[in-house]
Amino acid sequence: MSQKELWYETLHANFGQYFSVENVLYREKTEHQDLVIFENPVLGRVMALDGVVQTTERDEFIYHEMMTHVPLLAHGQAKKVLIIGGGDGAMLREVSRHKNIEQITMVEIDAGVVEFCRQYLPNHSAGAYDDPRFKLVIDDGVNFVNQTTEKFDVIISDCTDPIGPGESLFTSAFYEGCARSLNEGGIFVAQNGVCFLQQDEAVDSHNKLSHYFKDVSFYQAAIPTYYGGIMTFAWATQNRQLRQLDITTLQQRFVEAGLTCRYYNPAIHVGSFALPQYLLDALTTKR
């Protein structure tokens, strides 16, 4: 790619988005995927895997704050957290802000992602890889949750879209392993795409998760990079009350955690579980 070239995302067959490229910082075909980082004048550094944008410097905080603080503050007493994926380090950064957490395990299939993100996206991890509570495991996520004897309070699946290496993280085998790897009252959350364009994926995840969890739903956030509408995050737990916490309880936990966020707040937390009717209808009829 030349410095003035346009980079086109290939997630959808018939339409998409493009980015102007100021400078290509890194490109490599790793053992598992084709990876590129380039600079864009609006979004800063952009990372893409297999032709699909994964994260940008400009708006990554929305995604990572919602993926971490919603389940962690809903739980309230999490000590052990498992991150599946998350090689750019931003999920780890947000989890590590919770000082009551004692252990953070991250399972990443591709060691190359971790290495180049530390070099080319340093603001994502912001030093979190040096946190003494952190443990990195290079392994397939499905294999890990089905082999480990450890139990976790919160599991965060920072998966790619269900193509290529990320496809296995949308299977029943993975969801069953996650359910088994949670402590009592534990919470599982996962990236589940833009529901207007990827509605079938949301329905499929909902149906599969419902076999292993008593309370399955989604929450949402608007993230500019992921075009097409709101992004949905799968939510699954055995405790139905955790999704219905009142704003006063969340506000108290937020203050006690000493968090300062750019997107997340307790009101956003409560409102994020309100879903558009077209998704609710799909979840009801496509079973």
Curated annotation (Swiss-Prot):
Pfam families in the record: Spermine_synt_N, Spermine_synth
Keyword Cytoplasm among UniProt keywords: yes
Which pathway does this polypeptide act in? Amine and polyamine biosynthesis; spermidine biosynthesis; spermidine from putrescine: step 1/1
Catalytic activity, per the record? S-adenosyl 3-(methylsulfanyl)propylamine + putrescine = S-methyl-5'-thioadenosine + spermidine + H(+)
Provide the protein's localization: Cytoplasm
Q: Which SUPFAM superfamilies match?
A: S-adenosyl-L-methionine-dependent methyltransferases
The EC number(s) given in the record are 2.5.1.16
What does the UniProt keyword field contain? Answer: Cytoplasm, Polyamine biosynthesis, Spermidine biosynthesis, Transferase
Q: Give every PABS domain span.
A: 5-238
- Where S-methyl-5'-thioadenosine binds, per the record, is at Q33, E108, D140, G141, P165
GO molecular function terms attached to this record: spermidine synthase activity
The UniProt entry's GO CC annotations, sorted and at most eight, read: cytosol
> Which amino acid positions bind spermidine, per UniProt?
H64, D88, D158, C159, T160, D161
Q: Which residues form the active site?
A: D158
Group of enzyme by EC:
transferase
| Gene Ontology biological process | spermidine biosynthetic process
Q: Would you identify the family this protein belongs to, as annotated?
A: Belongs to the spermidine/spermine synthase family.
**Subunit arrangement?**
Homodimer or homotetramer.
Question: Which NCBIfam families does the protein's record reference?
Answer: MFS_SpdSyn (NF037959), PRK00811.1 (NF002010), speE (TIGR00417)
- PANTHER family assigned: SPERMIDINE SYNTHASE, SPERMIDINE/SPERMINE SYNTHASE
The UniProt function text for this chain reads: Catalyzes the irreversible transfer of a propylamine group from the amino donor S-adenosylmethioninamine (decarboxy-AdoMet) to putrescine (1,4-diaminobutane) to yield spermidine.
Query: How is this protein named in the record?
Result: Polyamine aminopropyltransferase
Give the lineage: Bacteria, Pseudomonadati, Pseudomonadota, Gammaproteobacteria, Enterobacterales
Q: Which gene encodes it?
A: speE
